[in-house]
UniProtKB/Swiss-Prot annotation:
A motif (GXSXG) lies at residues 75-79. Tuber. Glycans are attached at residue 115. This is Patatin group M-3.
């Protein structure tokens, strides 16, 4: 209820902000948002691989990376992990993972991450392997070293408040300059599935600052697109490169939002008669699924309405599979067979139409989006050279 109320407040604030300014491509803010969904992160990973390949082709540069084109990359849960993989620098100050490396990461490590602990008390998975592999991959890198602005959400169960890790917040809140592996584990620590994560940083005065964090989906309910747009708006207001952008002027935003799939209309749905017999535990599991699905639909609805109201619907692309069935609906089924099915879902999704009203496929839409990103990057570079 509180989440819906906050969405509505932001929604009407956006609609109330009008602007007749025509956006200059070089001054537009580019935003990538990636949903949570556990092992279903394979689906957006396929999309990212395709998009990065298109950018490399358009710019004739095999070393082009997504972080070179987006001003803000935001994610929650598995989307936060993807965000870190494509923005955390290696020893050459380039993203340590190309988009094509992400699916192999899931295929190799997924079965070990989602390896049932066997305990009847506590979470289903102990999280030890997940934390270990994140430490190995991300090392000692901290938020301030990210190659572009990031927005990774989590929730502090001790303070009962969301915690959003961004570079732009560090001057005011240096305690947020945490290690990326701590952030990634925290945003993925879904209640029931993984233990909460405790770690410390230090304030500007050198005092210890404690975090007691769980999955970012608790804060953003699975879809971080509105969060990512909010961070982008603040970034635009503070950066002179975006001087023409007004507060909450989404007409000057380019947003790509990637989902991890929702269930088919008739898969894992329930009747009132069935639900009337449920106990607290059964409701707990069902509510998480229902809340994530509702969030995905409603966030997309709000954002679509805003962009359409600004006659800027081509500036927003939501890539989502809405017909998952069987094992592909599970966020923790990391069996080889299911992961291969998720790869197929992502590849098939590229060939599907963006909407029932348009023959344009996601593949075609992403090619168009890649051209916009490329042109904007070149215009920005030319402007900076004068």
């Amino acid at each position: 209820m509180a989440t819906t109320k906050s969405f509505l407040i932001l929604f009407f604030m956006i609609l109330a902000t009008t602007s007749s300014t025509c956006a200059k491509l070089e001054e537009m803010v580019t935003v990538l948002s990636i949903d949570g969904g556990g092992i279903k992160g394979i689906i957006p990973a396929i999309i990212l691989e395709f998009l990065e390949g298109q950018l490399q082709e358009v710019d004739n540069n095999k070393d082009a990376r997504l972080a070179d084109y987006f001003d803000v990359i935001g994610g929650t849960s598995t989307g936060g992990l993807l965000t870190a993989m494509i923005t955390t620098p290696n020893e050459n100050n380039r993203p340590f993972a190309a988009a094509k490396d992400i699916v192999p990461f899931y295929l190799e490590h997924g079965p070990h991450i989602f390896n049932y602990s066997g305990s009847i008390i506590g979470p289903m998975y102990d999280g030890k392997y997940l934390l270990q592999v994140l430490q190995e991959k991300l090392g000692e890198t901290r938020v301030h070293q990210a190659l572009t602005e990031v927005a990774i959400s989590s929730f502090d169960i001790k303070t009962n408040k969301p915690v959003i890790f961004t570079k732009s917040n560090l001057a005011k809140s240096p305690e947020l300059d945490a290690k990326m592996y701590d952030i990634c584990y925290s945003t993925a620590a879904a209640p029931i599935y993984f233990p909460p994560h405790y770690f410390i940083t230090h304030t500007s005065n050198g005092d210890i600052y404690e975090f007691n964090l769980v999955d970012g989906g608790v804060a953003t309910v699975g879809d971080p697109a509105l969060l990512s747009l909010s961070v982008a708006t603040r970034l635009a207001q503070e950066d002179p490169a975006f001087s023409s952008i007004k507060s909450l002027d989404y007409k000057q935003m380019l947003l790509l939002s990637l989902g991890t799939g929702t269930n088919s209309e008739f898969d894992k749905t329930y009747t009132a008669q069935e639900a009337a017999k449920w106990g607290p535990l059964r409701w707990m599991l069902a509510i998480q699924q229902m809340t994530n699905a509702a969030s995905s639909y409603m966030t997309d609805y709000y954002i679509s309405t805003v962009f359409q109201a600004r006659h800027s619907q081509n500036n927003y692309l939501r890539v989502q599979e809405n017909a998952l069935t069987g094992t592909t609906t599970e966020m923790d089924d990391a069996s080889e067979a299911n992961m291969e099915l998720l790869v197929q879902v992502g590849e098939t999704l590229l060939k599907k139409p963006v909407s029932k009203d348009s023959p344009e496929t996601y593949e075609e839409a992403l090619k168009r989006f890649a051209k916009l990103l490329s042109d904007r990057k070149k215009l920005r570079a030319n402007k900076a050279s004068y």
